[in-house]
C-alpha cells in the first residue's frame, strides 16, 4: 500500500519542481548522490521527504494545525536564534502567532538518508506581514526525520534566519 501512495505523490509532482532537489541515499557508510529527476526505488523515500517539506511550507501559509500535528513527532524539538521549544509551542506559534505568511517555499533541498532516519537541508523563503510590517525572510534549515509505524515524522528542526543585507 505504501508503494501506491509513493507512486501517487511522485505522479503529482511537476518535473520542473523536482529539478530543484537533490537526494542522497546512504546504503553503506558514504552517501551517494542520486538524480532526483529520475527517481529510483532507493530514492523514492527521499521524494516523499521532499514532498513533506513542501507540505510544511504550505502549512505555514494556511496555518494548518492538523498537518503539523501529523508531521511533528511527540517530543519534537525546534531551535532557532536564541530559543529551543517543543511541539506544543511550535503548534501554537504556527496557528496563533502574530505573523501572517503570504508565501513560503523551499529551495535547494537535499536528503541524507541513514536507514530509518533522514536529514533534510535546504532554504525556506517566507514572505508576509507582522506587527512590524511586511517581511521577507530566508532561513537555512536542517530537519531530522524518523520513519516510525510506516510514516515519516519530524523529530527535530533548526532554522537559521539569514540577516537581511
What kind of feature is each model-predicted range?
Residues 1-15:
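Sec-dependent N-terminal signal peptides
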Residues 16-70, 75-165:
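A beta-strand edge to alpha-helix "cap/lid" segment located at domain peripheries
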Amino acid at each position: 500500500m505504501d508503494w501506491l501512495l509513493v507512486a501517487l505523490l511522485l505522479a503529482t509532482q511537476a518535473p520542473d519542481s523536482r529539478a530543484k532537489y537533490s537526494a542522497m541515499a546512504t546504503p553503506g557508510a558514504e552517501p551517494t548522490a542520486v538524480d532526483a529527476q529520475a527517481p529510483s526505488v532507493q530514492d523514492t523515500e527521499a521524494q516523499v521527504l521532499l514532498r513533506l517539506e513542501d507540505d510544511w511550507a504550505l502549512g505555514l501559509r494556511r496555518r494548518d494545525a492538523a498537518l503539523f500535528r501529523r508531521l511533528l513527532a511527540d517530543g519534537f524539538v525546534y531551535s532557532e536564534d536564541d530559543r529551543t521549544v517543543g511541539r506544543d509551542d511550535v503548534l501554537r506559534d504556527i496557528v496563533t502567532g502574530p505573523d501572517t505568511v503570504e508565501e513560503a517555499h523551499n529551495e535547494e533541498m537535499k536528503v541524507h538518508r541513514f536507514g530509518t532516519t533522514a536529514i533534510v537541508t535546504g532554504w525556506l523563503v517566507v514572505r508576509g506581514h507582522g506587527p512590524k510590517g511586511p517581511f521577507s525572510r530566508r532561513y537555512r534549515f536542517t530537519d531530522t526525520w524518523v520513519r516510525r509505524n510506516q510514516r515519516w515524522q519530524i523529530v527535530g528542526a533548526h532554522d537559521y534566519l539569514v540577516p537581511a543585507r
